Amino acid sequence: MSEISIATSVPSGPGPLIGNQPDGPAKVIVRDLNFYYGQNHALKHINLSLAANRVTAFIGPSGCGKSTLLRVFNRMYDLYPGQRAEGQVMLDGNNILDPKLDLNLLRARVGMVFQKPTPFPMTIYENIAFGIRLYEKISKSEMDGRVEKALRSAALWNEVKDKLNASGLSLSGGQQQRLCIARTIAVRPEVILFDEPCSALDPISTAKIEELIDELKEDYTIAIVTHNMQQAARVSESTAFMYLGELIEFGPTNKIFTSPNDRRTQDYITGRFG
């Protein structure tokens, strides 16, 4: 895809109460996005932008559409029949919903880390090298360097450098999740999607992942879905609150958590429903 300049504003029309937009240029702009599971209208007229090199958190009760939205960003829904998206999702000015789009290239540019760690049943080294080989042919020495760099970026190198030939499944839950992050980083994405990345982890592992996310935003644009309000407040610059497939409110995280404009946002954050 070509790199072209893009506007950073979100168009008017059906949509949420939107506060001040995040500082800096937008990496992703969503325009009047609708998504359907068969006849079920799961996402309704979504408009927002993801700022480059920032963390955007998506919060809301179960079934509100936040994970569905995340899966639109890398066309994961294409793997399942009967699902479709309408509207525009612009990545550096190119609509990723274009049916002619190369999905392998898109998923290299937009990586995803899932709720439960999903290491491949292979060695730690091969977990990282596998994805690189899908897109590039490089020498063994270059591969060694890429594997080390990815593991260092995921704050895992020092823990596994002496056992790279051990199974990825032999690692602890928190280490497995960081291995999955390293695997995502290894193919050099531009955007990383995190879908409840800490829900299966203990508090210590969660703290490591949160610290890692804060470091990763220097190089990547990040979107995270979380049910943990404290986590959203800690890691993100912008927060989107979703309810029943609609984007209710979107703006700076501090504003969303301290003085939201919509009563439903306030009620959810304070635990009155959800």
Swiss-Prot record:
The complex is composed of two ATP-binding proteins (PstB), two transmembrane proteins (PstC and PstA) and a solute-binding protein (PstS). Residues 1-21 are annotated as: Disordered. Its EC number is 7.3.2.1. It comes from Rhodopseudomonas palustris (strain BisB5). This is Phosphate import ATP-binding protein PstB. It is found in: Cell inner membrane. It comes from the Bacteria. GO terms for biological process: phosphate ion transmembrane transport. SMART domains: AAA. Its main location: membrane. The gene is pstB. Residues 1-11 have a biased composition (Polar residues).
